[in-house]
Curated annotation (Swiss-Prot):
Name the UniProt record assigns to this protein: Phospholipase A2 D6
Lineage: Eukaryota, Metazoa, Chordata, Craniata, Vertebrata
Entry PTM: Contains seven disulfide bonds.
Compartments in which it is found: Secreted
The family this protein is said to belong to: Belongs to the phospholipase A2 family. Group I subfamily.
BP-aspect Gene Ontology terms: arachidonate secretion; lipid catabolic process; phospholipid metabolic process
UniProt remark on cofactor binding: Binds 1 Ca(2+) ion.
Main location: secreted
Tissue expr: Expressed by the venom gland.
Binding residues annotated for Ca(2+), in chain numbering: Y26, G28
Naturally occurring in which organism (per UniProt): Micrurus pyrrhocryptus
Length: 29
């Protein structure tokens, strides 16, 4: 899902790169 991927990038930028590296992180979704 492209929209979900976009949210993952925003999550990564907001919290840390670690959230993006660990694709299974919750990130509020």
């Amino acid at each position: 899902n492209l929209n979900q991927f976009s949210n993952m990038i925003q999550c990564a930028n907001t919290r840390s790169x670690l959230x993006f590296a660990n694709y299974g992180c919750y990130c509020g979704y």
